[in-house]
Regions:
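Short, compositionally biased "basic patch" segments
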Residues: 1-7
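Short hydrophobic/charged patches on amphipathic alpha-helices used for structural packing
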Residues: 3, 25-29, 93
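Metallo-beta-lactamase
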Residues: 11-20, 91-94, 99-185
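Active-site HxH/HxHxD metal-binding segment of metal-dependent hydrolases
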Residues: 18-88, 181-185
Length: 186
């Protein structure tokens, strides 16, 4: 799972949580510049490390309510059901399928990036698409979430795409253009 740290105009957001080590803790403290970033978890893969980070730094964790039970002793736990807008203007959308509480985060222009966690996975030819695996929670819900996501995003300016999965397949590219989303794979 890949993590992303965003320094926005009036806030910071850590999207998914890296493996927590002392070096990572020090790097995150430096990146945060003394503010208290929100930690958004797009799926349950990083819950253990996120709870350690929360305990060490006190940063609030934001999860979709379906997965809040996995973080019983976390302070500053923020949950949402369908959608949530952060103070930075970034918006979260519940997109069940990969896990019951999967979500995506859209950061509006000027950044205009969709952080899609495990919802969309890089493949060959710089394409990104849904992948059904043994650990996929519910394939029909997954497909419905993809349709809901397409209707939720602003159509006038499609976002860049950032996946939390297997970035090494993307060679040097970290963000993909909207047209890399392969709807035929759905």
């Amino acid at each position: 799972m890949s993590s992303w740290f965003l320094s926005l105009d009036n806030a910071a957001v850590l999207i998914d949580c890296p493996k927590v080590t002392e070096e990572v803790i020090n790097d995150l403290k430096e990146l945060s510049g003394g503010i208290c970033p929100n930690v958004v978890l797009t799926n349950r893969d990083a819950h253990h490390d996120a709870s350690i980070l929360n305990r060490k730094l006190g940063w609030p964790l934001i999860v979709q309510e379906q997965e809040a039970y996995l973080l019983p002793h976390v302070e500053n736990l923020v949950t949402f059901s369908e959608e949530l807008t952060l103070s930075s203007g970034a918006r979260l959308l519940w997109t069940p399928g990969p896990t019951p509480g999967s979500c995506v985060l859209h950061v509006p222009p000027p950044w205009n990036v969709l952080f899609c966690g495990r919802l969309l996975t890089p493949g060959s030819n710089d394409q990104i698409s849904p992948i059904r695996t043994r650990s996929t929670f519910h394939w029909t819900m997954y497909q419905e979430s993809l349709l809901k996501l397409r209707n939720w995003l602003p159509r006038e300016q499609p976002p860049l795409l950032a996946s939390g999965q297997r970035l090494h397949l993307l060679s040097d590219e970290k963000l993909l253009p909207w047209i890399a989303w392969n709807p035929s794979a759905e």
